[in-house]
């Protein structure tokens, strides 16, 4: 998974903490989370890293984006297996029902804390302040 962050790690360990949060939410080893730190050309504004504020604000955005990504993965997996979305589950690498569908069978996606975005598929955008999610086509690129 790729985790693109808008927060700046100034020795506070936020890159590591956000990767830990994403790994926990996605039920995957932390080694499967690749962190891309802030890029001022594409990242939204961040007011800075103060005390533990980044963990609470960006951490919540990471959790919400991961939960939304899991829902999207389950929905796509259910469609591919032609079963009801509520009858499938996701274990961090596979969507399963009576049969198992590996992510590599149909998913090309990008999981990110503040914003997920990639070339094809779907994207989950998350505003860390308001938690509003814009309605748009989503993108993902998942690889291990």
Where are these regions (language model features)?
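Cofactor-centric catalytic regions
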Residues: 1-2, 6-26, 38-144
């Amino acid at each position: 998974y790729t985790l693109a962050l808008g927060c700046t790690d100034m020795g506070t360990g936020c890159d590591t903490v956000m990767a830990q949060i994403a790994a926990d939410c996605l039920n995957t080893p932390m080694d499967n989370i690749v962190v891309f730190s802030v890029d001022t050309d594409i990242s939204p504004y961040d007011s800075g890293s103060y005390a533990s504020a980044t963990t609470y604000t960006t951490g919540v955005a990471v959790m919400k984006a991961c939960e939304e990504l899991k829902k999207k993965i389950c929905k796509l997996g259910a469609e591919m297996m032609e079963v009801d979305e509520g009858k499938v589950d996701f274990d961090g690498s596979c969507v399963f029902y009576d049969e198992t569908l590996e992510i590599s069978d149909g998913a090309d996606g990008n999981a990110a804390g503040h914003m997920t975005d990639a070339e094809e598929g779907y994207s989950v955008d998350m505003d860390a302040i308001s938690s509003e999610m814009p309605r748009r086509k989503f993108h993902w690129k998942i690889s291990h």
